Amino acid sequence: MFSLSSTVQPQVTIPLSHLINAFHSPKNISVSVNTPVSQKQHRDTVPEHEAPSSEPVLNLRDLGLSELKIGQIDKMVENLLPGFYKDKRVSSCWHTSHISAQSFFENKYGHLDMFSTLRSSSLYRQHPKTLRSICSDLQYFPVFIQSRGFKTLKSRTRRLQSTSERLVEAQNIAPSFVKGFLLRDRGTDLESLDKLMKTKNIPEAHQDAFKTGFAEGFLKAQALTQKTNDSLRRTRLILFVLLLFGIYGLLKNPFLSVRFRTTTGLDSAVDPVQMKNVTFEHVKGVEEAKQELQEVVEFLKNPQKFTVLGGKLPKGILLVGPPGTGKTLLARAVAGEADVPFYYASGSEFDEMFVGVGASRIRNLFREAKANAPCVIFIDELDSVGGKRIESPMHPYSRQTINQLLAEMDGFKPNEGVIIIGATNFPEALDNALIRPGRFDMQVTVPRPDVKGRTEILKWYLNKIKFDKSVDPEIIARGTVGFSGAELENLVNQAALKAAVDGKEMVTMKELEFSKDKILMGPERRSVEIDNKNKTITAYHESGHAIIAYYTKDAMPINKATIMPRGPTLGHVSLLPENDRWNETRAQLLAQMDVSMGGRVAEELIFGTDHITTGASSDFDNATKIAKRMVTKFGMSEKLGVMTYSDTGKLSPETQSAIEQEIRILLRESYERAKHILKTHAKEHKNLAEALLTYETLDAKEIQIVLEGKKLEVR
């Protein structure tokens, strides 16, 4: 084996097995070196035709190399075999040792004279003239120097510049026989390899061996090159995949991913929102608020109509109202009617954990809006970003966002053509500088719908489902006092789901009443097993509430009473006013307290003070809240007068004691009134409790029948 190491070409290993087999083994060679000259001369007389029978015979045509020209053999031999010099004084890499000798062979047997080795071989004895002529024509070629060491990029670079011998090596190694044979000009008339070997008087057996060694070396070089390229390609692919996984892991980390993100997160606000399918026809039950916003839309469509009189486009509109009344729906209707760019943002989208992000997003939002003026910006949950500025060590930089919002709405730079619509259900938390004229010029209240508005909303949502003609939306509207638009939509949807579960083809009043009770009293829990004793206590408890509500003048009418467990309670009495109540009188508040006391009073009268239960805790909470508001907010206490007390913690001990005394008096009087009514109507109380134990649920008409002493129809 010869090791071909080059700094220019990849390492090529050329096995010349057939040529080396012609020489003796290492031991025989070492002996032949010390043989006298006379013995060598005697061996030279061996006939040439007595070649060893072990020499292999190979056809060059089988390797595909028979078409080589004659002129290629000289350069091929120059690139393949090293030159031999008898004079050891010639400077050569064969006489240079960096770590040890040039090969393991010389480490073991010492330096040999190559001509002596050749002359002692059987091949030389058989063909002395042929080998002598070949070796005389061979040129010095240092490519077969065995270079041993750590194969690193640093060591290879150092070898290129370490010694002049390496530079000579790099100069003599032309792109070797691989590049020479593949890129040679094919138009040149070169002699074939076969003719050249015949000219040099090389026997056919040795020609085949020589060509076989050449072919094997060429194929080995190609295989090693391909293997190296494949390894590099796989390594690069693995590193690239690991890099992608690393970047993905950083992006998934909530703390590190922010550093790789720009000021996105407000993409929905920066891009205009199209709301072509929502108009003011979809808004029901809030006619006054809708009228206010329709004027703004008209201003956007035809500004000359208003500016001819010197009017200006309003800069901000603040929508205020309880949850579910349609504030966001109104803003969407403005977007659909105005036909101008509409930008949406939520108050919680501005601020994050890093300082300055909120102010930057405010600037980006208004910069985009000004570039597309006239336009509308809708900020939902405005109290999240526009709350009052306070000095707090927990949020020392929270004022930057609202300050930037104030400057953009009405600051030094003009802001023409951009209308800001804000929505909140907590206007008390807004900063005073934000709600002043010039920023939010208009404040529109979006209240809960009245009976007429609830009827319109129910008709709108009923038209989206299949319902029976016997359904009367006005009856449902009168029984849903205080419901918002969102709650009415949920009521209709729950009724449709109930009808689908029961296998009905359309929604009837039964499903609507069921969904109303489910919203008012909670879902039924029929799987709960209650013993007769607790069921009896619950029946008398709920009957006590119903008796007080029925016989108290200013109490709200009864809607339904049940001892079916619903939600967290074992029973419930639903009260609904006949009409919308815009305010409440002192008599109505006292009646509510009396109704709340009815449950505990009934337990005490029927079962005794030792058997009262904890079921009245929520009733006492409700009664105490009413009494406290009457004393501290409504000015309904004769002793304390019309003064209000918003923060009782800052009051003097005497005042606090007086407030507590007045609340205690109101509760005691309410308890006594409820006890008087139940003692007076003890028979009706008993009949109603027995009816509840029998039927579990009674509506207003059935309760009236029982209290009048009549019998209910068998269900």
Curated annotation (Swiss-Prot):
Region ranges (Disordered): 34-54
Assigned keywords, A-Z: ATP-binding, Hydrolase, Membrane, Metal-binding, Metalloprotease, Mitochondrion, Mitochondrion inner membrane, Nucleotide-binding, Protease, Transmembrane, Transmembrane helix, Zinc
Mitochondrial matrix face of the membrane: 1-237
NCBIfam families, per the entry: FtsH_fam (TIGR01241)
Transmembrane domains' residue ranges: 238-258
Compositional bias ranges of the Basic and acidic residues kind: 41-52
Cellular component, GO, one term: mitochondrion
UniProt-annotated binding residues for Zn(2+): 541, 545, 619
Taxonomic path: Eukaryota, Metazoa, Chordata, Craniata, Vertebrata
Mitochondrial intermembrane side: 259-715
Record EC number: 3.4.24.-, 3.6.-.-
Example GO biological process: protein hexamerization
Gene encoding the protein: Yme1l1
Full protein name: ATP-dependent zinc metalloprotease YME1L1
Post-translational modification: Proteolytically processed by mitochondrial processing peptidase (MPP) to generate the mature form. Degraded in an OMA1-dependent manner in response to oxidative stress.
Keyword Oxidoreductase assigned: no
